[in-house]
Amino acid sequence: MLKQVEIFTDGSCLGNPGPGGYGAILRYRGREKTFSAGYTRTTNNRMELMAAIVALEALKEHCEVILSTDSQYVRQGITQWIHNWKKRGWKTADKKPVKNVDLWQRLDAALGQHQIKWEWVKGHAGHPENERCDELARAAAMNPTLEDTGYQVEV
């Protein structure tokens, strides 16, 4: 039987683009581990993706995961859009390159071994774990120490 894990995630950006951060909580059998980091220049969507990626990459074996995010971009991207992006060679329906492709590919690789149920929660609506992730993400964004090397300025 697979281990059952809960993951809660959030991303934050002070300006968009601007300094940003992510926060994630991984819960297994009542124990929690938190993750957060801040980047000097990024976007909110990249930080939302990073939160999910980092938490999933921390799992050491196959797990059954319930992943809660307040990002429709992440949830819809991974449950609906990614299949066609991959078929089209990481292009959108109008043949443009997928934004944040580096992170979508990393997220796709991180989910390979897990059974994942994606849940959307309304942000800033009193969901305790989402609020904690938001606090982690905001604190990280206020003290950014990393460079988001995959971030590309849109022209």
Swiss-Prot record:
Quote the annotated effect of N130A. Answer: Reduces activity
Q: Which SUPFAM superfamilies match?
A: Ribonuclease H-like (SSF53098)
Limits of the RNase H type-1 domain? 1-142
Q: Name one Pfam family in it.
A: RNase_H
> Where are its TM segments located?
none
Q: Which residues bind Mg(2+) 1?
A: D10, E48, D70
Please indicate if the UniProt record lists Metal-binding as a keyword.
yes
Residues annotated to bind Mg(2+) 2:
D10, D134
Q: What happens when the gene is disrupted?
A: In a strain that encodes a retron, the msDNA is abnormally sized.
Recorded catalytic reaction(s): these are:
Endonucleolytic cleavage to 5'-phosphomonoester
**GO MF annotations for this entry?**
endonuclease activity; magnesium ion binding; nucleic acid binding; RNA-DNA hybrid ribonuclease activity
Q: Which cofactor does the UniProt annotation name?
A: Mg(2+)
Question: GO CC: one term?
Answer: cytoplasm
Q: How does it assemble?
A: Monomer.
The name of this protein is Ribonuclease HI
Q: Which organism is it from?
A: Escherichia coli (strain K12)
